[in-house]
Each structure stands twice: as C-alpha cells, then as structure tokens.
Amino acid sequence: MSNTQSFFSQPLAERDALVRGALSKELERQQSQVELIASENIVSRAVLEAQGSVLTNKYAEGYPGKRYYGGCKFADEVESLAIERVKQLFNAGFANVQPHSGAQANGSVMLALTKPGDTVLGMSLDAGGHLTHGAKPALSGKWFNAVQYGVNRESMLIDYDQVEALAKEHKPSLIIAGFSAYPRQLDFARFRAIADSVGAKLMVDMAHIAGVIAAGRHSNPVDYAHVVTSTTHKTLRGPRGGFVLTNHEEIAKKINSAVFPGLQGGPLMHVIAAKAVAFGEAMTSDFRTYIDNVLANAKALGEVLKEGGVDLVTGGTDNHLLLVDLRPKGLKGTQVEQALERAGITCNKNGIPFDTEKPTITSGIRLGAPAATTRGFGVAEFREIGRLILEVFEALRANPEGDAVTEQRVRQQIFALCDRFPIY
C-alpha cells in the first residue's frame, strides 16, 4: 500500500494508538458513569457522524452566497439548513450559526452593540451568572464597566428591584439576562421593561435552557430581547458551539460583521453540519418528550435530596439543574465532587450565592438531568441516583477523606444501572 493510500485508509488505532487509547478510555468512562454535569449531554450518532465528516476539510470564510473561497456550494447548503432550522425552532427572523462557542456568541454581541468602556449589567458569577457576563477575569469584565446584579439573600431568586435600581443608576448600554447556575425561570418581560426604561439593549443568554425553550416549556426570549445567544450543546443536545438570534435586521447585520470578520475567521463547517442535525432533531415530538423527561427527572432528584436533609438553592428547580447547598451537611464542593466521581457519578463543584468558600473549594455542587435522561433514565432511576448520592454524603460526613467501601458499593450499583441503559 502506498503512503497516499494508507493516508486515506489507515484507521486511527493504527496511525495513533495513544490518541485512540485515550478516546477508548473516555468512551468507557461515559458508558459506565452517570453524567450529572448540567452543561453536558450526549449527542446522537448522527450528530457525531456529521461532525466527523469531510466538511472538516473545507474553508468557507464569509456567509452562504458570499464566500471568500471557491468550492463552497455544499458548505452553503449545510449552513443554510442550520440557519433556517434554528430560525424556525425559535421563531426568529435572523440567525448566525458560526460562533465557535457560547463565549464567542456573547463576545460578538458586545462587539456589535457596545464599545470598550461602556457599562454592561449582568448577573454576578457568585449569584449564578456566567464568566462572559462581566466577571472580572473575563474580557467582558476587563473591557467594559461591568456592573453585577445578584439574588435576594432570603429567597435566592433574582432581585429584579436591584436590577432596576442598578440600571437606573449606571445607565448600561447592554443588560444581560442568563445564567450558568440558576434553577428558576427568568422573567424576560421584566428584563425588557428595565432595559427600555434606561435605553439599554437586552441580550438573553439562553445557553442552559435553549432545549427547554425549543420544546416550548419556557417562554421564548426572542419575543422580548433585542438579541439572544446560546450554545448548541447542553439541553439542546447538539455539538459544542454557539449561535445568535434576533428579530431586528440592523442588529443582525452588526452581528454578522462582529462574528466575521470581527471575532472569527473561517467557520467550523463540520460543526455547523452537526448543528444542523441537532436543530432538526430538536424540532421533533421526541425531543419535546425528552425535555419533559429532563424536567421531571430534575424535580425527582431534587425531591429525594431534600427528603435526605439536603438544602437546594431556591428550594427546587424549574429547569434541568439543581444547585445543592452542602453547608447543612458540613461538606465542601471539591470534597463531594471527588467522592462522587470515585463512586461513578460526575458533577461539578459550584459556588452558591453568598458563598464564603474559595471558588476552588465552594459550598455547593451543581447537578443536571440532561445527559442521564438522554440515555433513557426516568424518574425511578433518578430517585435511585439521589439515594446513592445521599449514601456518599453520609459516608463523607463520617469520614471526610472518603469511604472507599461505600464508594465502591455505590460504584457497582451505578455500573449496573448504566449497563441497563447503554450508549454507542
């Protein structure tokens, strides 16, 4: 076999055994562990196939019909499919599907609608917001006068009166509604009224709840915001990437220029193909049933944890995630994250509102239902997972360094559970 022939035919296992080995171990991890990280999901075989397609080879700077490279006929076809599907999915007039991530989508809005030094009002990272909403370490916190709103100390719900007061005091150019760790619905109408009262643009970052919105189970922010951003993974169950929506033609033109050439060069056409597939999947009745199951499973998990004496921030959830306050159990986020992983359950440590622990330690964990629901888990399985989590909690209280016997017993039960619901 010639070198050229082998280049196109030699499988990964032969060409690079080290990478193949790591991928095989990662597949085994995903198959045998329960994934409760709220921002993660499991994509379909079709999405994987599209992302691993020959579009990996294609440069396509520009937009459909207006490329800076030749040979883009089929790239145009794929991107146009993605655009039309996401517009239909969220009833939006305009869409840009090229952002490589949610952070890039948010950055493109800031580039399009603000200038360095402007005031931006977003949710504090400490209260459940996202880095890109004005956190000090992020570009949005360095290039802008970032003012942050939070939650009520008693209810742990967004303090809309505070949002309004801060908006009137600081006169932001942009108000951001969205979160990375907030378990309740957002009042988009209230946010828009506040934005209008000070002449600000409203951006909704729906990354975490895009799938819930697509299924019609939460209100659609496109009806309220000047511009909406999102990731394509999480509850939308697509590849890792981003997109931007708006109903305003002038804003759409600015967004397109901000994405390319403002922030990015060539789009990742293989990822856009996978986005198109995921958008198509999200338009089905099966997807709506899936989201209903996600919401039911998250509630069931929360109920079991509360029955076991665990505090939930806001007392429960309206969406796919739970924010668990570990302080009543005398535990730390890092400690619990590590113990649960040893027991076959992956989650992430997470700060809670008014947390006094360092971000590397935290007083909480974040749990989510999307990935385990994708593999077929229902309410019964999530209640079982909740009971197993409580076992690990109690073992940690008795032995803060970890209880190997309990963790191994739980891991065996988790493995048996996963074996009943195989993936790939």
Swiss-Prot record:
Substrates-to-products reaction catalysed: (6R)-5,10-methylene-5,6,7,8-tetrahydrofolate + glycine + H2O = (6S)-5,6,7,8-tetrahydrofolate + L-serine
Entry keywords, A to Z: Amino-acid biosynthesis, Cytoplasm, One-carbon metabolism, Pyridoxal phosphate, Transferase
GO molecular function annotations of the record: glycine hydroxymethyltransferase activity; pyridoxal phosphate binding
Cofactor(s) the protein needs: pyridoxal 5'-phosphate
Residue positions where N6-(pyridoxal phosphate)lysine is found in the record: 234
Record: residues binding (6S)-5,6,7,8-tetrahydrofolate: 125, 129-131, 250
Metabolic or biological pathway: One-carbon metabolism; tetrahydrofolate interconversion; Amino-acid biosynthesis; glycine biosynthesis; glycine from L-serine: step 1/1
BP terms from Gene Ontology: glycine biosynthetic process from serine; tetrahydrofolate interconversion
Its biological purpose: Catalyzes the reversible interconversion of serine and glycine with tetrahydrofolate (THF) serving as the one-carbon carrier. This reaction serves as the major source of one-carbon groups required for the biosynthesis of purines, thymidylate, methionine, and other important biomolecules. Also exhibits THF-independent aldolase activity toward beta-hydroxyamino acids, producing glycine and aldehydes, via a retro-aldol mechanism.
PANTHER family assigned to the protein according to its UniProt record, in alphabetical order: SERINE HYDROXYMETHYLTRANSFERASE, SERINE HYDROXYMETHYLTRANSFERASE 1
Subunit structure: Homodimer.
Name used for this protein in its record: Serine hydroxymethyltransferase 2
Organism for this UniProt entry: Cupriavidus pinatubonensis (strain JMP 134 / LMG 1197) (Cupriavidus necator (strain JMP 134))
